[in-house]
Design a protein with these regions (language model features):
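Residue-identity detector for glycine
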Residues: 8, 19-21, 59, 63, ...
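N-terminal extension/subdomain marker
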Residues: 1-82
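Short, solvent-exposed loop/turn and secondary-structure capping segments
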Residues: 36-37, 96-102
């Protein structure tokens, strides 16, 4: 799924794109054991789209807010720009927080108003990421606020989270 999305972006990067914009991708090709920060760009010398690894992260956990904060800082340092955009592609749990775990079969079949009710004492929030590597939206917010720049847009390409950013 993710590789296909990255290939789709790469197919759109041609010599017909004006300007000097840069596209960076953080991808975990080895499941959850590592990550790579890559740049997707058109190379006039080879006349094709190239993917170049800018940085490799060993033991990268996308569910760790500090690791995510550092990833954003690294991207800004390696590709300084006037404007930034962010697309997050992973699994999503919509309005269900990380601490809720997996939904049981009976919960999936509950009435709609029961399914989205927060547990007693829990903050209503959202999470995304694979089981054990999830990040709450509030943790993403903190990682974003720690940066010296702001993203111009944020898109979730996640199950259950399409259009949740609005």
């Amino acid at each position: 799924y993710y590789e296909r999305n990255i290939e789709g972006v790469s197919a759109a990067v041609t010599n017909q794109i004006p300007g000097d914009g840069r596209i960076l991708v953080c991808y975990q090709p080895e499941k959850h054991s590592s990550a790579v920060l890559q740049e997707i760009r058109y190379d006039p010398a080879t006349e094709r789209c190239e993917r170049t690894t800018l940085k490799t992260y060993d033991g990268f956990n996308a569910g760790n807010p500090e690791k995510v904060r550092q990833l954003f800082a690294d991207a800004a340092e390696l590709a300084p720009a006037q404007n930034y955009g962010l697309i997050i592609g992973c699994h999503g749990k919509a309005w269900i927080p990380v601490a809720s775990g997996s939904l049981s079969y009976s919960m999936r079949r509950s009435a709609e108003d029961d399914l989205w009710a927060a547990p007693p004492g829990a903050k209503q929030t959202r999470s995304f990421g694979d089981k054990g590597y999830e990040l709450n939206i509030t943790e993403l917010k903190e990682a974003l606020e720690a940066q010296q720049f702001r993203f111009d847009y944020l898109i979730f390409d996640d199950c259950f989270m399409a259009n949740i950013e609005t």
